[in-house]
Amino acid sequence: MNTSEQPKLQYFHIVGVKHILPGDAFDAIKNNEAVLIDVREMFEVQLEYIPLEQVLNHPMSVIMDRLPYIAKDQKIIVICAHGERSVKVANLLQYQGYPKVANLDGGFEAWKNAELPFESVLPVSGCGCHSSENRQPERLINNPVNNPTISNKIDFKKIRRIENETK
Protein backbone atom coordinates (compact mmCIF):
# COMPACT_ATOMS: atom_id res chain seq x y z
CA MET A 1 0.00 0.00 0.00
CA ASN A 2 1.23 3.46 -0.86
CA THR A 3 1.03 5.29 2.49
CA SER A 4 2.45 8.50 3.93
CA GLU A 5 3.42 9.63 7.43
CA GLN A 6 1.45 12.90 7.15
CA PRO A 7 -2.14 13.39 5.93
CA LYS A 8 -2.76 15.52 2.85
CA LEU A 9 -6.56 15.84 2.92
CA GLN A 10 -7.26 16.30 6.64
CA TYR A 11 -5.81 18.21 9.58
CA PHE A 12 -6.22 15.70 12.41
CA HIS A 13 -3.24 13.39 12.82
CA ILE A 14 -1.71 11.09 15.43
CA VAL A 15 2.04 10.54 15.16
CA GLY A 16 2.74 6.98 14.04
CA VAL A 17 -0.48 6.50 12.08
CA LYS A 18 0.00 6.12 8.34
CA HIS A 19 -2.36 7.65 5.80
CA ILE A 20 -3.46 6.47 2.39
CA LEU A 21 -5.14 8.56 -0.33
CA PRO A 22 -8.57 7.44 -1.56
CA GLY A 23 -7.37 6.39 -5.02
CA ASP A 24 -4.56 4.27 -3.60
CA ALA A 25 -6.96 2.76 -1.05
CA PHE A 26 -9.44 1.87 -3.79
CA ASP A 27 -6.70 0.14 -5.81
CA ALA A 28 -5.56 -1.86 -2.76
CA ILE A 29 -9.14 -2.89 -1.94
CA LYS A 30 -10.04 -3.71 -5.54
CA ASN A 31 -6.90 -5.89 -5.88
CA ASN A 32 -7.69 -7.72 -2.61
CA GLU A 33 -4.53 -6.35 -1.01
CA ALA A 34 -6.41 -4.75 1.90
CA VAL A 35 -9.72 -4.68 3.70
CA LEU A 36 -11.56 -1.44 4.47
CA ILE A 37 -12.99 -1.09 7.97
CA ASP A 38 -15.72 1.56 8.15
CA VAL A 39 -15.92 2.86 11.74
CA ARG A 40 -18.91 5.14 11.14
CA GLU A 41 -22.04 4.35 13.11
CA MET A 42 -24.77 2.25 11.46
CA PHE A 43 -27.10 5.21 10.90
CA GLU A 44 -24.32 6.90 8.87
CA VAL A 45 -23.64 3.76 6.83
CA GLN A 46 -27.36 3.35 6.09
CA LEU A 47 -27.33 6.78 4.44
CA GLU A 48 -24.11 6.40 2.45
CA TYR A 49 -21.83 3.41 2.00
CA ILE A 50 -19.15 1.88 -0.20
CA PRO A 51 -20.59 -1.07 -2.17
CA LEU A 52 -17.54 -3.35 -2.13
CA GLU A 53 -17.17 -6.85 -0.66
CA GLN A 54 -13.97 -5.94 1.16
CA VAL A 55 -15.71 -3.29 3.30
CA LEU A 56 -16.51 -4.24 6.89
CA ASN A 57 -18.58 -2.09 9.22
CA HIS A 58 -17.21 -2.06 12.76
CA PRO A 59 -18.50 1.18 14.38
CA MET A 60 -16.05 3.00 16.62
CA SER A 61 -18.50 2.65 19.52
CA VAL A 62 -18.06 -1.15 19.50
CA ILE A 63 -14.61 -1.57 17.95
CA MET A 64 -13.12 -3.21 21.05
CA ASP A 65 -15.82 -5.90 20.90
CA ARG A 66 -15.06 -6.51 17.22
CA LEU A 67 -11.28 -7.00 17.54
CA PRO A 68 -11.54 -10.83 17.64
CA TYR A 69 -13.17 -10.70 14.18
CA ILE A 70 -10.37 -8.67 12.58
CA ALA A 71 -7.38 -10.68 11.33
CA LYS A 72 -4.04 -9.29 12.48
CA ASP A 73 -2.14 -10.48 9.40
CA GLN A 74 -4.15 -8.52 6.81
CA LYS A 75 -3.63 -4.99 5.58
CA ILE A 76 -6.31 -2.72 7.03
CA ILE A 77 -7.53 0.68 5.87
CA VAL A 78 -9.77 2.49 8.36
CA ILE A 79 -12.39 5.00 7.18
CA CYS A 80 -14.87 7.33 8.87
CA ALA A 81 -16.70 10.47 7.70
CA HIS A 82 -13.77 12.92 7.69
CA GLY A 83 -10.76 11.00 8.98
CA GLU A 84 -10.79 11.89 12.67
CA ARG A 85 -12.39 8.78 14.15
CA SER A 86 -10.52 6.54 11.73
CA VAL A 87 -7.14 7.98 12.82
CA LYS A 88 -8.04 7.17 16.42
CA VAL A 89 -9.13 3.63 15.54
CA ALA A 90 -6.02 3.08 13.37
CA ASN A 91 -3.90 4.16 16.34
CA LEU A 92 -5.86 1.82 18.64
CA LEU A 93 -5.44 -1.10 16.23
CA GLN A 94 -1.69 -0.51 16.12
CA TYR A 95 -1.55 -0.59 19.92
CA GLN A 96 -3.59 -3.81 19.87
CA GLY A 97 -0.97 -5.51 17.67
CA TYR A 98 -2.23 -4.86 14.14
CA PRO A 99 0.96 -3.92 12.23
CA LYS A 100 -0.48 -3.13 8.77
CA VAL A 101 -2.98 -0.32 9.40
CA ALA A 102 -3.57 2.96 7.56
CA ASN A 103 -6.12 5.75 7.85
CA LEU A 104 -8.05 6.73 4.73
CA ASP A 105 -6.88 10.32 4.35
CA GLY A 106 -9.88 12.66 4.40
CA GLY A 107 -12.40 9.92 5.15
CA PHE A 108 -15.62 9.19 3.28
CA GLU A 109 -15.87 12.80 2.07
CA ALA A 110 -12.49 12.48 0.32
CA TRP A 111 -13.61 9.12 -1.12
CA LYS A 112 -16.70 10.77 -2.63
CA ASN A 113 -14.71 13.78 -3.86
CA ALA A 114 -12.36 11.38 -5.66
CA GLU A 115 -15.48 10.04 -7.45
CA LEU A 116 -14.92 6.50 -6.21
CA PRO A 117 -17.89 4.10 -5.96
CA PHE A 118 -20.44 4.76 -3.23
CA GLU A 119 -24.18 4.45 -2.75
CA SER A 120 -26.36 7.09 -1.13
CA VAL A 121 -29.98 7.64 -0.21
CA LEU A 122 -29.35 11.35 0.34
CA PRO A 123 -30.33 14.02 -2.20
CA VAL A 124 -27.60 14.97 -4.66
CA SER A 125 -27.14 18.41 -3.08
CA GLY A 126 -28.08 19.96 0.21
CA CYS A 127 -28.33 18.66 3.73
CA GLY A 128 -31.60 16.82 3.25
CA CYS A 129 -33.89 19.65 4.34
CA HIS A 130 -34.81 20.49 0.71
CA SER A 131 -34.15 24.20 1.32
CA SER A 132 -32.01 24.39 -1.82
CA GLU A 133 -34.88 23.26 -4.04
CA ASN A 134 -37.17 25.71 -5.80
CA ARG A 135 -40.19 26.38 -3.66
CA GLN A 136 -43.27 25.43 -5.56
CA PRO A 137 -46.77 26.48 -4.46
CA GLU A 138 -47.97 22.89 -4.08
CA ARG A 139 -45.13 22.20 -1.62
CA LEU A 140 -45.98 25.12 0.68
CA ILE A 141 -48.09 24.56 3.76
CA ASN A 142 -51.34 26.49 3.86
CA ASN A 143 -51.72 27.88 7.36
CA PRO A 144 -55.37 28.88 7.96
CA VAL A 145 -54.35 31.52 10.51
CA ASN A 146 -52.45 33.40 7.79
CA ASN A 147 -55.45 33.34 5.47
CA PRO A 148 -57.81 36.23 6.39
CA THR A 149 -60.87 34.66 4.76
CA ILE A 150 -60.50 31.59 6.96
CA SER A 151 -59.05 33.14 10.12
CA ASN A 152 -61.88 35.71 10.32
CA LYS A 153 -64.32 32.82 10.70
CA ILE A 154 -62.42 31.27 13.62
CA ASP A 155 -63.38 32.37 17.13
CA PHE A 156 -60.03 31.99 18.91
CA LYS A 157 -61.65 32.74 22.31
CA LYS A 158 -63.69 29.53 22.15
CA ILE A 159 -60.76 27.28 21.21
CA ARG A 160 -59.87 24.95 24.05
CA ARG A 161 -57.38 22.16 24.49
CA ILE A 162 -58.78 18.69 23.87
CA GLU A 163 -58.08 16.49 26.87
CA ASN A 164 -58.24 12.71 27.05
CA GLU A 165 -61.47 11.86 28.76
CA THR A 166 -61.79 8.56 30.56
CA LYS A 167 -65.22 7.01 30.62
Kindly label every feature range from the protein language model.
Residues 2-34, 42-75, 84-167:
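Rhodanese-like catalytic fold shared by cysteine-dependent sulfurtransferases
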Residues 78-80:
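Short, surface-exposed ligand- or partner-binding patches at beta-edge/loop junctions that are enriched
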